[in-house]
Amino acid sequence: MNKSKRLFTKSKRSFRRRLPPIQSGDRIDYRNMSLISRFISEQGKILSRRVNRVTLKQQRLITIAIKQARILSLLPFLNNQKQFERSESTPRTTSLRTRKK
């Protein structure tokens, strides 16, 4: 390969292959909360297949298991805890409001 072509070739970078999120021994089941909770967002939504890096068959089984756990009240449908937390509010000033008598 001559020098002019060598300038445009990219060097191959080594990359570390990620471990699969579901090992062969793991059983996808609605009772296996430690496994299911890895595939749910903070809001309680089911994460997509691309984010989870699982196969189509595994994603289908995960989705079914999560839905079963929700129906059986093992998982919440929504996880909006921020909605119920009260933030520190500023004290109301009553001097701005004047009532007409």
Curated annotation (Swiss-Prot):
The source's superkingdom equals Eukaryota
- Pfam families, per the entry: Ribosomal_S18
Recorded GO molecular functions are:
mRNA binding; rRNA binding; structural constituent of ribosome
Alphabetically sorted, this entry's keywords are: Chloroplast, Plastid, Ribonucleoprotein, Ribosomal protein, RNA-binding, rRNA-binding
Q: Which PROSITE patterns match?
A: RIBOSOMAL_S18
| Main location (coarse class) | plastid
Q: What stretch or stretches form a coiled coil here? A: none
Gene3D superfamilies from the entry? Ribosomal protein S18
Its Gene Ontology cellular component terms are: chloroplast; chloroplast envelope; chloroplast stroma; plastid; ribonucleoprotein complex; ribosome
Query: Does Lipid metabolism appear among the keywords?
Result: no
Q: Which InterPro entries match?
A: Ribosomal_bS18, Ribosomal_bS18_CS, Ribosomal_bS18_sf
Q: Where in the cell is it found?
A: Plastid, Chloroplast
Q: Which GO terms describe its biological process?
A: translation
Instruction: Tell me which family the UniProt entry assigns to this protein.
Output: Belongs to the bacterial ribosomal protein bS18 family.
Q: Subunit structure, briefly?
A: Part of the 30S ribosomal subunit.
User: Any idea what this protein is called?
Assistant: Small ribosomal subunit protein bS18c
